[in-house]
Amino acid sequence: MKRVKNNKHAYLIMAHNEIELLKVLLSLLDYERNDIYLHIDAKAEGFEISELMECVKKSKLFIVEPRLDVKWGNFSQIECEYRLLERATPQKYMYYHMMSGVDLPLKTQGEIHQFFDENYGTEYIQFESSELTNEEKNRVSKYHFIAKRKKNIIEKILYRVSLMLQLKIDRTKKSPLEYRKGANWFSITDDLAQYVVKNKKIIEKYFRYTICGDELFLQSLVYSSEYRKNISENNFCDNYETIKYVIDWKRGNPYVFRESDFEQLVSSGQLFARKFSWNLDKRIVEKIK
């Protein structure tokens, strides 16, 4: 793969709470070879843009607006990722890193850039090792007009009726995509980022009115494309080392790291970790900082 002229990285951040933690994240990403693109959920309160700007001295920080009301399981999550990619891709960065506002880097930016310089061309996308379960297939094969985690009794009834009326409907039959699932955090090259943006209409057609499509759309698009060859077989596993992340789903949903986890994190060899909470345990955040 031919290297892009721009050797900078773009960090794409989706934030919705934890203001103090976000400030730490921005300060840890502040580096000459980074630009930072930040989307703040429309529901979020207490974010002072001027305070966030003060966290960045070496990078450029871009606030992506208008702000979306991002809802769990909703297409708005995919739309938010596209907003970030569409804002950043005209600059043709070397790598694009999708993160949430409650993630933190575990290495210095110099070490992170060295890793991606040495492994340029590899796409860091996590795929689950198995194919979709029937429940996961239903997320994309049916129209989910009420994609809420907590539904009231009327919404639950309407939701079940709508699925019953769709027993013979399978949206995936005419789809050009082979569906796969994985984490929605990634590090991808400019070539792939441009391809993802170019194919937005396909994603809109087959992922609008799905549930948790943010865990499926990128994996499905890449798996069905020539970029599949840039994915190592090691990426098809049920851990997050393939995207250089530490995420613990065994102790939580996912687990929020505490101060007692510090040695485990720094000795993991990974570049990033998810997730943290300034309100729950700021000591681990201060140690990483």
What is the role of each PLM region?
Residues 1-289:
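ER/Golgi luminal nucleotide-sugar-dependent glycosyltransferases, focusing on the catalytic module
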